[in-house]
Swiss-Prot record:
Basic and acidic residues biased stretches: 316-327
SUBUNIT field: Interacts with CROCC. Interacts with POC1B; the interaction is direct and recruits POC1B to centriolar microtubules. Binds to centriolar microtubules.
One Pfam entry name: CEP44
Main location (coarse class): cytoplasm
Annotated protein name in UniProt: Centrosomal protein of 44 kDa
Modified residues (Phosphoserine): S342
């Protein structure tokens, strides 16, 4: 994009803003960069604050431009330009919001300002026509009254013959009447006619003063129109406040329902809950391991008892020989006693079987303990725990 085109478009914008009487400072750097923040204040001023007629048109068409973000503002402006001004911008909404397209954006701003000034002239001319008609009617009423006033203000004289004579080019109506020789007495009929003419003039003069009294009313209406944009802004703010209050009531009702649902419940953080679960699992494993250790200790004690008893039997051979002798001697009753060798043999056999069973159970217990230790190690390795 050439710099000359940008300078030309900026000059055009300055001229339009001068004709618009724009009171604020213009961000020329932002306009050259194509920043939307530099162009939006100009558009909002032209549509809301420049012309009371345009502001009234916005109110009649239920268009709100105040208290909106950039996207909604541009959306409403594009709709307003399409519906009320019959203007379609060159750029789309997305392109206008994006940074860039500086020359096109300046051209669109100039077009919008020209459209607003044109609409202002149209609406002001429409309001001027009824006021001009009122002035014409008032002037038409004042003309006959002024003519009657001129006729009445002219000096009237009474001729010797009893005629009313006015000084001037215009001749007054001559009223003939009879009079006595004693004095020229004017009859009552002529006096009443003249009084009626003056009364008519007074009525017309009063009618002329009525439109003069209506002029300050028109000025008051214009002042009301200038105040209307501020009133519309306040109305829009009130509407937004009402919407926010409705949302607050909805949020309060939801909070109350949540409080009723969450009565009697305890909220725990995920990390703390995971830590608690890991601790519980560790405690369970400790309990199991302690039980296994107790069982293993009891089993060792039992095996030690069995081994000590077997050693004691081996240390007493004399006792065994005596028992064998007693077994070889037949009893007098005829019954044969069971040999004493059977008891230690059976005890040794039972001891061997118990030893094998105990070894198997210990191996199984050790494997289970290994599995438990591995599971606890995996649980402790997890980062959440």
């Amino acid at each position: 994009m050439a710099t000359g085109d940008l300078k030309r478009s900026l000059r055009n914008l300055e001229q339009v803003l001068r004709s618009l009487n724009y009171p604020r400072e213009v961000d020329c750097v932002g306009l050259v960069k194509g920043d939307t923040a530099a162009s939006l204040p100009i558009i909002s001023y032209s549509l809301t604050s420049y012309s009371p007629y345009v502001a009234e048109l916005l109110v009649d068409s239920n268009i709100e431009l105040l208290a909106k973000n950039d996207l909604r503002f541009i959306d409403t402006v594009y709709k307003l330009l399409r519906d009320q001004f019959n203007y379609k911008p060159i750029l789309t909404k997305k392109q206008f919001i994006q940074c860039g397209f500086a020359e096109w954006k300046i051209q669109i701003i100039c077009d919008i300002l020209n459209c607003v000034m044109k609409k202002h002239k149209e609406l002001s001319s429409l309001e001027k026509t009824p006021s001009q008609q009122r002035k014409k009617t008032s002037s038409a009423k004042s003309e006959p009254c002024s003519s009657t006033e001129k006729t009445s203000t002219e000096p009237v004289g009474i001729d010797v013959t009893g005629r009313f004579v006015t000084s001037g080019k215009k001749k007054a109506v001559v009223i003939r009447h009879l009079y006595n020789e004693d004095g020229a007495n004017i009859p009552e009929d002529t006096v009443t006619d003249v009084n009626e003419a003056f009364d008519v003039c007074d009525i017309k003069a009063a009618e002329i003063t009525i439109p003069e009294l209506q002029v300050p009313d028109i000025n008051c209406e214009q002042e009301d129109i200038t105040v209307n944009p501020e009133v519309t802004a306040l109305q829009s703010m009130l509407a937004e406040c009402q919407e926010k209050l409705k949302k607050l009531t909805c949020i309060e009702s939801r909070l109350e329902s949540l409080e009723e649902k969450m009565k009697g419940k305890v909220l725990v953080n995920e990390k703390t809950w995971a830590n608690l679960l890991s601790r519980v699992t560790l405690l369970e494993t400790e309990m199991l391991l302690s039980k296994k250790n107790d069982e293993y200790m009891q089993f060792n004690e039992m095996s030690e008892d069995y081994s000590s008893s077997s050693d004691m039997d081996s240390l007493n051979p004399d006792r065994k020989s005596k028992e064998e002798r007693h077994a070889n001697i037949p009893l007098s009753s005829g019954y044969s006693t069971v040999s004493s060798d059977s008891t230690p043999r059976t005890s040794t056999v039972n001891y061997c079987g118990l030893k094998e069973i105990s070894e198997e159970t210990t191996m199984q217990k050790m494997e289970r303990m290994k599995k438990m230790f591995e599971e606890t190690a995996e649980l402790l390795k997890c980062p959440n725990h």
